[in-house]
C-alpha cells in the first residue's frame, strides 16, 4: 500500500461505503494509524453520513476515499464539495472510482475526464490522474450489485487533488504604495529632444526639402461648385399635395414656405382707395366709413355698426 505522503501527527479521514469489505477497511485503518502515530488521528466516515457528520472546516490533512480494497465507490458533486470543505489549506485528496472508457450520457458512472472536472469544480487544484487498473471479476460483480451498472468498458482510476493554500471566501488586506502627488506649481521637466521634435520654425517653412501639402490641391473642381439648394433637399421633403417641411428642416424648404405665407398674408390685407383709413380722422376722406373711429393697425379687423353704414 502506498503511504500517500502521510506523516506523524497528521489528521487523516478514510471514506468508505457499503461495498467496502470490513476486514479490508480495518487493515487499512491499522496501517494509517501506524503512520500518523499517537499525535495524529485517523477518522472513518461512511460516504452516506459524511454530509450529516458536520465536520468543522479544515479538519483533515489528507482524505482517502474509495481506496479500501474491493470498494466501488461513486462520488457525487455534493460529496466532493464537502471533502474540499473539510480539507485543510494545502491538504490532499486521494480518490479511487470506477469509470467508463466510453462516453455514455445515460450512465451514472462518469468518465475519467468528467471525474477530474468534478474535482476541479469542487474547489481543488493540481488535479491529476495517478494510475488506471482493470477491475477484477469480484469488483465487476460488486459494481453490478451495489451500483446496478453493467458494462464491458469499466476500469478503476486513481486521482489526486489539492486544496489551495487559502480558505474559500477568505480575504486579506492589500498594502498599496500610494505616492504623493506633486505640487501643482511644480511643472514636469521637458525633454529637449522631444520639444525639438515637435517644434516647427519659420525657417522650416522656407526649406525646400520640406514637403508641405497644399490643402487646396486636395479639392476637386466639383468640390468648389456651389450646390443647388434643390439638390440638398431630402427625397421625401415637400412631397404630397400640401407641401410641408420636415422637422428640423435644413434644406431651406421651411424658410421658403414661411416667405410664401408672409406674401399671402400681405396680399390678403384689405386696401382702401386712399390707403390712409387706419391713420385716423385727420387722414380720412369725407365719405370714409371709419370717420369718428380711432386709428387702427393695417389689416386689423374693424366692425362697423348699421348706423355707420347708413351714414356712409
Curated annotation (Swiss-Prot):
Region (Linker) spans which residues? 173-224
Q: Entry cofactor note text?
A: In the presence of oxygen, the A site-bound [2Fe-2S] cluster is labile and the B site-bound [4Fe-4S] cluster is readily converted into a [2Fe-2S] cluster, a reason why recombinant protein is often isolated with a single [2Fe-2S] cluster.
Q: Tell whether Nucleus is among the UniProt keywords.
A: yes
- Necessary cofactors: [2Fe-2S] cluster; [4Fe-4S] cluster
Record: residues binding [4Fe-4S] cluster? 274, 277, 285, 288
Residues of the region (Fe-S binding site A) are 237-251
Quaternary context? Monomer. Interacts with NDOR1; its oxidized form can be reduced by NDOR1. Interacts with CHCHD4 and may be a substrate for CHCHD4 chaperone activity.
Q: Briefly state the protein's biological role.
A: Component of the cytosolic iron-sulfur (Fe-S) protein assembly (CIA) machinery required for the maturation of extramitochondrial Fe-S proteins. Part of an electron transfer chain functioning in an early step of cytosolic Fe-S biogenesis, facilitating the de novo assembly of a [4Fe-4S] cluster on the scaffold complex NUBP1-NUBP2. Electrons are transferred to CIAPIN1 from NADPH via the FAD- and FMN-containing protein NDOR1.
Q: What family does this chain come from, according to its entry? A: Belongs to the anamorsin family.
Identification of the protein by name: Anamorsin
User: Quick one: which gene encodes this?
Assistant: CIAPIN1
